[in-house]
């Protein structure tokens, strides 16, 4: 055993260092004051620095790192198989390879926990704003759903449509506007006031669609990344959602709420439409579960072109329903829950409580 440790001393020290970081993280995550200091005074400024540095490049550094990681994984697998075949001491060689892989995995876990996982235990948007997603009454849900449907219909008159009657817009223009979309919220929520880095479109967006993702925030580069292949009608609200993560907000319900609020209040027609659309979709889904007839009545009041957009969006995502999307969303759900968010990906639906309480 001593020989095994001595022969792999560096890998063992690496393992112990990662383990120590993770142990300290789990010990201190319950100390709200310490976590708040770490998040808002250390990691958030650091991620903003990374975001500014990466903003100078016209492509997503996060996507590049994912590609490099995939290529590196294949190369390492080939090298390790070759090493195991040539080694005379198969057991020791296998142990060394397994230890190396474990070290890499724990390094990523430790870094992710420090840069992003800690945010789950810091004061969130609701803590800092005083808003709370209290359970809502049926009457409030119906009233706010109708309110969003009415404003969605109005917003629809100010956007462009293609020859098929579907929403159309220059996607790059939507991305370019994103760094000003939160300006309208700073008076009400001054703690949100910080420089934004524009979201970046992902080149391999179809892969994101297969995984059922419209966007993601990458803490290792401070970049917000968005799917450029999915229906354009919600691209603006996706941008606003991902920009909330640049502010250290981890809760998906709070990010969706902020996306709706910022989009509907800003002075860009494409963002207005996406904001009212995102809110209506969440509210409508919640209403349908409790009263399909009330949902149908509101749905029937929508102009035909909005219904066309909704059907196109549903048809687009229907083609990607399968094992890949199921597995990916399951892993994402488990990751979110591992950091104490009991709702997991279900928290995307809890935005309804915030919307109804705010607009009722």
Question: What residue spans do the PLM features occupy?
Answer:
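Alpha-helical transmembrane segments and their helix-start/interface "positive-inside/aromatic belt" motifs
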Residues: 5-19, 96-101
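Membrane-embedded alpha-helical segments of integral membrane proteins
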Residues: 19-82
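Active-site recognition of the HExxH zinc-binding catalytic motif
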Residues: 58, 235-256, 260-261
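Transmembrane alpha-helices and immediately adjacent membrane-cytoplasm interface residues
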Residues: 74-78, 92-126
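Membrane-interface segments at or immediately adjacent to transmembrane helices
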Residues: 117-187
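Post-HExxH zinc-binding segment in Zn-dependent metallohydrolases
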Residues: 139-143, 148, 250-294
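Auxiliary, metal-adjacent structural segments of Zn-dependent hydrolase domains
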Residues: 160-228, 232
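Pan-zinc metallopeptidase signature
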Residues: 305-360
């Amino acid at each position: 055993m001593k020989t095994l440790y001595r022969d792999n001393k560096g890998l063992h020290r690496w393992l112990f260092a990662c383990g120590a970081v993770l142990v300290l993280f789990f010990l201190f995550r319950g100390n709200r004051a310490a976590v708040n200091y770490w998040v808002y005074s250390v990691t958030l400024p650091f991620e903003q620095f990374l975001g500014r540095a990466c903003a100078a490049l016209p492509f997503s550094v996060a996507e590049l790192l994912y590609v490099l990681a995939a290529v590196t994984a294949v190369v390492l697998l080939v090298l390790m198989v070759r090493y195991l075949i040539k080694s005379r001491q198969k057991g020791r060689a296998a142990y060394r390879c397994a230890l190396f892989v474990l070290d890499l995995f724990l390094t990523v876990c430790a870094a992710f926990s420090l840069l992003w996982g800690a945010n789950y235990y810091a004061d969130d948007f609701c803590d800092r704003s005083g808003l709370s997603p209290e359970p809502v009454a049926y009457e409030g849900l119906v009233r706010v759903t109708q309110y969003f449907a009415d404003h969605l219909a109005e917003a629809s008159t100010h956007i462009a449509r293609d020859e098929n009657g579907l929403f159309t817009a220059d996607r790059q223009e939507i991305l370019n506007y994103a760094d000003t979309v939160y300006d309208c919220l700073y008076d009400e929520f001054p703690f949100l006031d910080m420089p934004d880095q524009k979201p970046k479109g992902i080149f391999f967006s179809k892969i994101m669609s297969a995984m059922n993702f419209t966007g993601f925030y990458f803490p290792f580069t401070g970049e917000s990344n968005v799917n450029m292949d999915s229906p354009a009608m919600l691209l603006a609200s996706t941008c606003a959602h991902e920009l909330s993560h640049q502010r250290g907000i981890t809760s998906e319900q709070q990010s969706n709420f902020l996306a709706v609020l910022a989009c509907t209040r800003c002075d860009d027609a494409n963002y207005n439409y996406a904001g009212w659309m995102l809110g209506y979709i969440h509210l409508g889904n919640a209403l349908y579960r409790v009263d399909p007839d009330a949902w149908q009545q509101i749905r029937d009041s929508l102009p035909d072109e909005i219904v066309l957009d909704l059907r196109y969006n549903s048809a687009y995502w229907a083609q990607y329903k399968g094992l890949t999307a199921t597995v990916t969303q399951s892993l994402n759900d488990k990751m979110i829950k591992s950091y104490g968010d009991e709702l997991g990906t279900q928290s995307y639906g809890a935005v309804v409580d915030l919307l109804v309480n705010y607009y009722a």
